[in-house]
């Protein structure tokens, strides 16, 4: 089974963008479209979709997902988690796009109103314990047991070890990109990730790349 750690996934991302020449915004769009495909193919209640987006590239994916849902006529709310001034350039670009589309960001969203939550707060780049405020928000979302689709990996899960970094959103489905992550098969990561679906978004492997060898038990590939 082809599995990668967080560092290996970042290596693959960098190689695809910097050496192959694939623009990052193309990867973001492909990632977003793959999540839209899963949402459309699943038996989810789509009456009110809440997208939670963070400061990094995972958040950029989430913003693009919200835009695609919005343009398809879905009732979607986008809540940005974190200080916008600290967001990556990819996030700033996606925020500018949604403003031009007329999608207004919600300052605060009520989890109780959402029928589906898309988790795009933190991806494989998470390497610290989540801030206390975010941990509190995650625990509140888990408490009301909403259906969650995680983008690449549930927020709070270490992509290499599967351990929880303070708190983690429990996902019904995780749409992960390129290759499955070791952390989605190990420790509590295998439980909290739910049904894992691997989507090809055009990532390419560096020469002589070697996959991490682990035997997962919850992987679904498409």
UniProtKB/Swiss-Prot annotation:
Cofactor(s) recorded in Swiss-Prot or TrEMBL: K(+)
Keywords (A to Z) from UniProt: Isomerase, Metal-binding, NAD, NADP, Nucleotide-binding, Potassium
Catalytic activity: (6R)-NADHX = (6S)-NADHX; (6R)-NADPHX = (6S)-NADPHX
Gene Ontology CC terms, in alphabetical order: P-body
Annotated positions binding K(+): 58, 119, 155
Residue numbers binding (6S)-NADPHX: 57-61, 123-129, 152
Annotated EC: 5.1.99.6
Free-text cofactor note: Binds 1 potassium ion per subunit.
Residue ranges the record marks as coiled coil: none
Single annotated GO MF: nucleotide binding
Domain YjeF N-terminal: 9-209
Entry keyword annotation includes Isomerase: yes
GO biological process: deadenylation-independent decapping of nuclear-transcribed mRNA; P-body assembly
Database matches in PROSITE patterns: YJEF_N
Domain of life of the organism encoding this protein: Bacteria
Biological role: Catalyzes the epimerization of the S- and R-forms of NAD(P)HX, a damaged form of NAD(P)H that is a result of enzymatic or heat-dependent hydration. This is a prerequisite for the S-specific NAD(P)H-hydrate dehydratase to allow the repair of both epimers of NAD(P)HX.
UniProt similarity note: Belongs to the NnrE/AIBP family.
Name recorded for this polypeptide: NAD(P)H-hydrate epimerase
Recorded name of the encoding gene: nnrE
């Amino acid at each position: 089974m082809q599995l990668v750690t967080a560092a290996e996934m970042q290596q693959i991302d960098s190689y695809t963008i910097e050496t192959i020449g694939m623009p990052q915004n193309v990867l973001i769009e492909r990632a977003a479209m793959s999540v839209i495909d899963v949402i459309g193919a699943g038996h989810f209640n789509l009456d009110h979709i809440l997208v939670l987006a963070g400061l990094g590239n995972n958040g950029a994916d989430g913003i693009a997902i919200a835009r695609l849902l919005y343009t398809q006529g879905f009732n979607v709310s986008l809540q940005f988690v974190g200080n916008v001034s600290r967001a990556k350039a990819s996030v700033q670009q996606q925020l500018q796009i949604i403003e031009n589309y007329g999608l207004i960001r919600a300052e605060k969203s009520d989890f109780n109103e959402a029928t589906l939550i898309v988790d795009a707060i933190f991806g494989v780049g998470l390497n610290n314990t989540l801030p206390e405020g975010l941990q509190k928000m995650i625990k509140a979302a888990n408490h009301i047991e909403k259906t969650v689709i995680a983008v690449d990996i549930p927020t709070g899960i270490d992509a290499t070890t599967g351990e929880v970094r303070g708190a983690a959103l429990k996902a019904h489905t995780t749409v992960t990109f390129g290759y499955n992550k070791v952390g989605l098969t190990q420790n509590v990561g295998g439980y909290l990730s739910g049904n894992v679906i691997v989507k090809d978004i055009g990532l390419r492997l560096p020469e002589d790349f070697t996959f991490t060898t682990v035997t997962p038990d919850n992987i679904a590939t498409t």
